[in-house]
Amino acid sequence: MTDISEKLDPLVDYIMKNCLWQFNSRGWDRLKQNAGILSQTCEILCGEEPVHETAMDRCYWVDAVILSRAYKARFPWLMAMTKPEIKSLFKALHEKIDHLTVHGSLNTELTVPHY
């Protein structure tokens, strides 16, 4: 697996099929959740300890722990990657998930300002 899309696609597929947090009803909430969960998942996979001081940090941290465990179990090649490679992959993953769940979504409810 040398092409980033070969690594990215199964990670995206897992989130889209198994993670309910991607379905928040407001676009800005989805963006915050994506950033919080994916950044903490990346930190965990890089052997770092995510900051979880606030209630929202802890909420994202729980989902990040679950996602990192699933990724380690299903995609053992992740653990053979270097920290910079993991961070680069997760940057691309974050961009792809933001596009699929918010920016490229046809769900007009995501942009209702009073919702």
Swiss-Prot record:
Its cofactor is iron-sulfur cluster. GO terms for molecular function: ATP binding; iron ion binding; iron-sulfur cluster binding; nitrogenase activity. Disulfide bonds: none annotated. It is an enzyme of class 1 (oxidoreductase). Keywords: ATP-binding, Iron, Iron-sulfur, Metal-binding, Nitrogen fixation, Nucleotide-binding, Oxidoreductase. GO terms for biological process: nitrogen fixation. It catalyses: N2 + 8 reduced [2Fe-2S]-[ferredoxin] + 16 ATP + 16 H2O = H2 + 8 oxidized [2Fe-2S]-[ferredoxin] + 2 NH4(+) + 16 ADP + 16 phosphate + 6 H(+). It holds the Pfam family AnfG_VnfG. Its EC number is 1.18.6.1. It comes from the Bacteria. Hexamer of two alpha, two beta, and two delta chains. The key enzymatic reactions in nitrogen fixation are catalyzed by the nitrogenase complex, which has 2 components: the iron protein (component 2) and a component 1 which is either a molybdenum-iron protein, a vanadium-iron, or an iron-iron protein. This is Nitrogenase iron-iron protein delta chain. It comes from Rhodobacter capsulatus. The lineage of its organism: Bacteria, Pseudomonadati, Pseudomonadota, Alphaproteobacteria, Rhodobacterales.
